[in-house]
Amino acid sequence: MKSPRFRHSQKYIGSKPYYGYYENDHYIVSWCRGHLLELKNPEEMDPKYKLFQLEHLPLIFQPSYKVIQENAEQLQILVKLLQRPDVDHAVNICDADREGELIYREVYEYAGVNKKQSRVYKSSFEAAELEAALNRLESASKYDGLAYSAKARQYLDYLLGMNITRGCTTKLAQNKFLLSSGRVQMCLLHEIRQRELAIENYREQSYYHLQLITDLGLKPVMKTEDQVLNPSPLKSLGENLKDQYLTVEDFKEGTRKQNPKLLYNLTDLYKDAHAQLQINAETAKKHIQNLYEEGFITYPRSSSRHLPTEQVDRVKGVMQALAKSRYSLLVQSVDIDAIDIKHKTFDDDLVSSHFAIIPTTKQYQEEGRPEIEKQLYSLVVKRFVGNFMRPAVYLVRDVSLIDAMGNTYQIKESVLREKGFLEVFQEEVKEESVETFKVPILQKGQELQIYDFELQESKTKKPALHTESSILTFMETAGRKIDDEHLKELMKGKRIGTVATEAAFIPVLHEKNFIDIEKGKIITTPIGRAFIEQFPVQQIKDPLYTAEMEGMIHRIEKNEMSYENFIAQTNAFVQKITQEIIRIPDTVSYNLIETWKKQIEVCQCPCGNGIILDRGKFFGCSNHPNCNKGLPKRVKEKTIPTAQVKKLFEENKTDIIKGFKSNGKEFSAYLAFVNGEVSFNLPSVEELSLGQCPKCQKGKILNRKTFFGCSEYQNGCDFMLPAKIKGKKLSDSQIKKLVNNHVTDFINGFSGEKGEFTAAIRLKTDLSICFEFPTTDDRTVGKCPLCQSRVIIGKTNYLCEQYKRGCDFIVSGMILEKRITASQIKKLLEKNMTDTVKGFVSKKTGKSFDAKLTYDSTQKRVTFIYEKKK
């Protein structure tokens, strides 16, 4: 078992600590730190494999293990304990999953012993549960299928990864750089590229619905099987139907329930952590694992959203424990006594090895805990408690009508009758509802006269670039994306990768320079695009294949497929893959290498004889070992932007970089070369200053993340400005204007009761702040190039005050995902050209680019002026 888990239990068991284990009269307890052994690389089994050569492929051998050196000491402790003559029984209490089983079996087999073996397979390690499990041990042989499935997955990934990497590095990269990948990585890279291609090929289309206007004020909409792209037939139909009648074909009134969200599985928890806490899955994983190991939540690496029926009493116990915590008010919305096996959460058929993630009865003390961990625990608790609240109940009226030509029309209306869980979780309202029904009770055969019609125009939706959250969804539901219904059924329950490993794949692809992540959007790099497009084995890219492999591994776990059969199929497939890679034309290799060279070049090295290259985990000189200049890609938990690396090597100093971390605290600094070594230069208060403090007149106003405050706060100055006002985060530049000029520019995006609004913030003489709302003169940014009237700032556009009254001048405030500032529009109107605006995102490629804007008075639209590449 893991050492943190036992340390939290030892006070109950009363064991004495020894170096690397605990012991009492009945038990010896020791632990692993993840895997203590790993698979050998080919060159460690035969030196001839040190060189990557095509004639070596395919490489097919039985896995052979080596000791992970940093864990060698603990492994030897375990081996000696297992080999002790007085030890006659080994109990596996590692994680209740494939990896936990494999970690134990690797050590046991390495020790070379033959002793009685048992298993504790629990989703929680609360002390009472652990003690009960030790009193009711299961036979280790019951989990042989699980062990073989773990070995099968390990063998599959080992063999495929080794042969794909060596084959592609040798054939595609000509051994000039490493092209490392595996089955899941290739599948995900392919999906990311396919989404980019869908965006590039997207063409927006309008489609139309016919809405009739009838007596009783009702507006039924015509039902169509497909999107209607041509409005003319609908318009003709609408004209013909005027003064005719619709007949009520069916009227239904009933209730519809909206249930609370199901309990968390790991994928859902990762996605909410990404959406609500703005953290990636890899970061969330560390804190979730810590919550589990310390006994605050149940086993997290679960794909289930349900609980077995035997957990009813446990749920009640957890609710009662939470009722004594800071979540007591939340728990009051649950009728604990009414929880029973009839609740939708309890379903034995929908729980496999592990049930959903829920809190335990152990009280979580927030003091001293990491902020992210606290927020993740809160997500788990709120989802758990909300799941057992009453559903929301809507009263629904649904009317189906028919015209004289047999076309069908529909009206639906809902009234929220019982709020249920929506009383607490208001953000989860899914459907529009009205206070009272406008649709009256209608009788079948009743006629409604048609007075007029409207054509409703809608636009097809452009696909969005993938985010980490959407990739997690793709991994979980890959089978359900297939159109064929039979294949959908076959793929049910299968996925890409496992919940235990899904957090790692996006960071790995990013680390290998196959993808970039810009503002949360995932895009392929030039080398990532070239690699996935030229990789010849379609099966490896196909989610169906990857999920089928997971399905076969699952069948081994259930003893429905033999390990030997799986190995034979894997070996045959590897033979096929290597042959396809070997047949790749040499011209493909040349183009890929040229793409790689362009991608990794950053700037000239100061040594004068080399180029600074992006080497993956670090930047270094191409003239190595003659030049040792370099920089790690991540410094103090901050990934250094390539633009700043370029600046460092060209100018010896970066700009101020925010987001370095030391002892859990963020700080800003320059990176600079001092005597040839990279060092931190902390910015002075003057450099960070946004202006002189208007209160004490001595200190400087500094950005403190959640507020702006005076540098003299320790000497008694309490002047402070919030970082966010009415939902709008204020920029350093606007705070600088507020402090120095006592008023900001007009800022868009404040949130009020009536929606978003624009205002300036003024610092009054008593140092309080207030809003100033723009007059027409304030909103004027210049003269219209078409009619010479005033151009004013609208809600979402810059437009002529005569717009729709004879003038067509209008410019969107958001162009290709980039907000256009009023100052740039002023320059556009004065000089017919803005400055270079950075960060437009191409509709065709999804890539960002920089350009100036100009206004074409003939075509009456803005156009781009691209800077010539030097």
UniProtKB/Swiss-Prot annotation:
Its EC number is 5.6.2.1. GO terms for molecular function: DNA binding; DNA topoisomerase type I (single strand cut, ATP-independent) activity; zinc ion binding. Residues 180-185 are annotated as: Interaction with DNA. The active site is at 299 (o-(5'-phospho-dna)-tyrosine intermediate). InterPro entries: Topo_IA, Topo_IA_2, Topo_IA_AS, Topo_IA_cen, Topo_IA_cen_sub1, Topo_IA_cen_sub2, Topo_IA_cen_sub3, Topo_IA_core_domain. A zinc finger (C4-type) spans 603-627, 693-717, 784-807. One of its GO terms (biological process) is DNA recombination. Monomer. This is DNA topoisomerase 1. It comes from Bacillus anthracis.
